[in-house]
């Protein structure tokens, strides 16, 4: 694992712990109390697909949003609520605040970070960019507000290919950060001239190609869905490579009844909701004596619990603040992404 110490990974697991098992009655009480607090505080709950199913269900029940990071950003930007509660990891809360500086933004915990974010410190990244001033800086959404402020473009896995293709068509050379696997995939698909930062996601980097081949042999009729943050050897085995939303769409679209899925298992909630007659299997994250650390579930996403969500609302704790001096610089590449994807949607609608 690059730039992330073993101690940090172990501590992340210790901090996450396993959520206390709640009885059905306790869950119902927490959900009712959270719904009441959201209404009372003019707040909306926005949850990522990788959160635990109970959090995703709560977001849906209360008129919020369950989505990938791009749609979370768009939803927070467009929703009328004065307060946004982001169930996800810290960069998602920061993104909501950057796009909505006038709103109050909270998270169930501020400890929920991301290995990609931590693996791209702004000082080191800025120095890297300064060595290549002729290049356009494109960063993945999984980065800090400070890194976004240093960038020309922010992208998500759902729009990265199209944006890089557009930049390449304009003759631009690119610095890409932080996920090396996603960067390599984009580079291979587009042929763009890209310098890659050396970061990786602790969940997706654990998927194993040899074990995936063995699993495919057990389920020969299964389609393999792979997130592009996965290693290249895993991507090569995929029937579909895409963002969380793109994988969900593929599960709905493809005729296969069984799917092997190489991403965080939190996505199964939405897949099973939309495709109740289909079977979804976790891609293997261990084998040949190797043990998994994340085991197909982000330890930081797991920190978003019902108890922490209610505590956050009642106490007004875990509010997200972003340096006001950074916001004008960080909002520019984010707004470019939103404008680009909105224009692409309109073009697609016009061609429908």
Swiss-Prot record:
Please provide, in alphabetical order, the Gene Ontology terms of the cellular component aspect for this entry. Answer: cytosol
- Tell me where the signal peptide lies: none
Annotated residues that bind iminosuccinate are located at 48, 69, 140-142, 157, 227-229, 244
Q: What is its EC number?
A: 2.5.1.72
Q: What is its main location?
A: cytoplasm
What UniProt keywords are attached to this protein's entry?
Answer: 4Fe-4S, Cytoplasm, Iron, Iron-sulfur, Metal-binding, Pyridine nucleotide biosynthesis, Transferase
Which Gene Ontology terms describe the biological processes this protein takes part in? 'de novo' NAD biosynthetic process from L-aspartate
Pfam families annotated for this entry? Answer: NadA
Q: Which reaction does it catalyse?
A: iminosuccinate + dihydroxyacetone phosphate = quinolinate + phosphate + 2 H2O + H(+)
Q: Which InterPro entries match?
A: NadA, NadA_sf, Quinolinate_synth_A_type1
Cite the binding residues for [4Fe-4S] cluster.
114, 201, 298
| Pathway involvement of the protein, from the record | Cofactor biosynthesis; NAD(+) biosynthesis; quinolinate from iminoaspartate: step 1/1
Q: Kindly state what the record says about how the cofactor is bound.
A: Binds 1 [4Fe-4S] cluster per subunit.
Role this protein plays: Catalyzes the condensation of iminoaspartate with dihydroxyacetone phosphate to form quinolinate.
Family, similarity comment: Belongs to the quinolinate synthase family. Type 1 subfamily.
**Which PANTHER family does UniProt cross-reference here?**
QUINOLINATE SYNTHASE, CHLOROPLASTIC, QUINOLINATE SYNTHETASE A
Q: What is this protein called?
A: Quinolinate synthase
